[in-house]
A protein has these predicted regions:
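Acidic, Ser/Thr/Gly/Pro-rich intrinsically disordered interaction regions
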Residues: 2-38, 45-211
Length: 211
């Protein structure tokens, strides 16, 4: 008999969910956070296969070269495109790489940041690598993730758009319609770049407006 059958896990789960609401994370927040993490994961895993396509290198019976690539390098490679693709297609990939960089920074702050709670009636935020207690010399980047309206919707849209793009890139040399599909995504990818940049730099933008 599985051990969870003798433990009231539904009640415990609901208790934890209630405790999270007391931190200001309402059900909609948790749903959209989950949706964003899934969509970003779809982009991230499909990106690897898209890079195999762009490199035109076989990975059969060899360790994929992407396995040891730093995240920043994967975005750089995406942005470089491929000389066999059209100028319009490569231009879309270049913008997508910049969007991915901003969105990845937001994702890291959300997943790895400290939750800053102001009580059940206020929306919390997340702070990554803060300089608390007089600490200095951190080599990891500082970051913020805000989940106020409309930021969660914006990052979900951006992540989904990037996934659609790399899904098309993966088959760009086998599907005769893929390149045209990529070109047609220009507006969506421009929008993803705008959204991702806004959420990544929201703290700086807010401080600038105050000044």
């Amino acid at each position: 008999m599985p051990p969870y059958t003798t433990y009231n896990y539904p009640a415990k789960s609901h208790e934890i969910q209630y405790r999270l609401t007391q931190l200001g994370l309402q059900p909609k927040h948790m749903m959209l956070i989950g949706g964003f993490i899934v969509a970003y994961g779809m982009f991230e895993t499909t990106l690897e296969r898209a890079l195999w396509t762009l490199s035109e290198r076989s990975i059969e019976q060899v360790r994929p070269f992407t396995e040891t690539m730093p995240t920043a390098e994967t975005f750089k490679m995406l942005g470089a495109g491929n000389q066999k693709l059209s100028e319009k297609c490569n231009a879309v990939l270049k913008v997508a790489a910049r969007a991915a960089e901003d969105l990845n920074d937001y994702r890291n702050s959300l997943v790895h940041g400290y939750i800053l709670s102001f009580g059940p009636n206020d929306v919390p935020s997340f702070l990554r690598n803060p300089h608390w207690h007089g600490a200095t010399g951190r080599k990891k980047a500082h970051g913020d993730a805000f989940i106020d309206e409309p930021f969660q919707d914006l990052v979900l849209i951006a992540a989904w758009s990037l996934w659609r793009l790399v899904h098309a890139v993966e088959k760009v040399f086998t599907d005769p319609e893929a390149q045209a599909d990529i070109e047609s995504m220009k507006d969506d990818i421009d929008r993803a770049k705008s959204y991702a940049g806004e959420v990544r730099h929201q703290a700086a933008l807010a401080n600038h407006e105050k000044n």
